[in-house]
């Protein structure tokens, strides 16, 4: 159970990389889990659905409903996602915890890197966020 942490399973610096794909938003304490990732590994890599993608914004703003998209396919009442976030939210969390972002990539639902527009407006046009990070050096 990731919500219980990794201490019972791994010692400090057991790995070069710790990867969590499409799971962070479904944990009880994402910030504590990121800390655990960096305790057992030198670097972390996470991916998560971007709640600020334009399609989610449109559903919330114009229809007044919690978004249901290909990357957020469940209704609000049966979703495993308990901590939805945006690129900006994740970057603020990292800053508060002394975590350095080494690389950020945003992709569409088919995992393709976008056009220059996606690079210009990643929080609006990126459907999935991918971050590589470490403790501040």
Predicted stretch roles:
Residues 16-30, 48-49:
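A short SAM/SAH-binding and catalytic strip from SAM-dependent methyltransferases
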Residues 1-9:
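Adenosine-cofactor binding site in Rossmann-like domains, unifying the SAM/SAH pocket
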Residues 32-36, 43-137:
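S-adenosyl-L-methionine-dependent methyltransferase catalytic module, highlighting the catalytic core
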Residues 8-9, 16, 61-66:
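Short, flexible segments with low predicted structural confidence
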Residues 4, 25, 53:
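Active-site micro-motifs of SAM-dependent methyltransferase domains
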Residues 13-14, 40:
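Alpha-helix C-terminal capping/helix-to-coil transition sites in glycosyltransferase folds
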Residues 1, 24, 28, 113-114:
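Short gly/ser/thr-rich secondary-structure transition/capping motifs
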Residues 9-11, 37:
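Structural alpha-helical scaffold elements that stabilize or flank donor/cofactor-binding regions
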């Amino acid at each position: 159970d990731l919500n219980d942490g990794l201490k019972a399973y791994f010692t400090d610096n057991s790995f070069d990389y710790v990867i969590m794909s499409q799971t962070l938003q479904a944990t009880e304490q994402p910030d504590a889990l990121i800390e655990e990732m960096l305790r057992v590994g030198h670097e972390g890599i996470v991916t998560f659905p971007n709640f600020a993608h334009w399609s989610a914004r449109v559903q919330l703003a114009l229809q007044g409903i919690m978004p249901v998209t290909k990357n957020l396919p469940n209704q609000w009442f049966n979703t495993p996602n308990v901590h939805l976030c945006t690129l900006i939210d994740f970057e603020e969390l990292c800053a508060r915890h002394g975590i350095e972002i080494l690389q950020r990539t945003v992709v569409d639902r088919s995992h393709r890197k976008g056009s220059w527009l996606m690079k210009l407006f990643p929080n609006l046009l990126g459907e999935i966020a991918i971050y590589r990070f470490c403790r501040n050096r």
